[in-house]
Amino acid sequence: MLQLCKVQAVSVKEAHAKIKDDPAEWTKARKEFEAAGLRIVSVGKIDFALDTDEDVDRNFKYAQALGAAGIVMAPQLAVLPRIERFVKQYNVKAFIHCHGPEDKVFPTPDSVLKAVQGMDARMGLCLDSGHTIRAGVDLIAAMRQAGPRMLDFHIKDLRDLKDRNTSCQVGDGAVPVSTIFKTLKNMSYTGDVNLEYEVLADNPLPGMLGSFAYMRGALAGITV
């Protein structure tokens, strides 16, 4: 399916490789992705539920074994100093995913930026277009404010910018997709943009193809 979408990079979730599995299974999963021509760029979302060296270390070993340069995470504030220590040890980035108004810890990009202020530059933000807009935040302004702390980007489209249940094919909704890509280019953004297509789970391919086609068209149309 991903090959039909002509993508070369992927963010891996536990559905693809489980953290609790033997590390040999992680290596096996990585080889399977690589054999399919896919490079694993990140893993997660990981919650870092236990504030212990053993648990945090295993999550970083998992990311490293899969060849991921970063971890998408949704931790509690108290765990961040420990995570930062392992970021330095493994040279693996860790970016907090803001989840909108339902998230009691990190609802907005600004809440993430405040949490990682003063920390290692590899501690940052995974900005989600849909959740950010639903939180009542100016998406483009938030991107610019985050600057180099924005290490990862999840893109989705919504027909109703206040309703998470109106997710749709990218380009069919109200999220300013073209402006997003223009802003990323103007910022000289070097991270990944991951499509989150959460529609028609039984037959997602047509919508994925349409989403990638729209995004590639938006990129091609950028002149500055």
Where do the PLM segments sit?
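Histidine-acidic metal/acid-base catalytic patches
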Residues: 1-6, 106-127, 131-224
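Active-site acidic/histidine proton-transfer and metal-coordination neighborhood
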Residues: 9, 32-127, 133-136, 145, ...
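Short, acidic/turn-prone active-site loops that include or flank metal/cofactor-
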Residues: 15-16, 100-101, 155-157
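Stable alpha-helical elements in mature extracytoplasmic
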Residues: 29, 59, 79, 83, ...
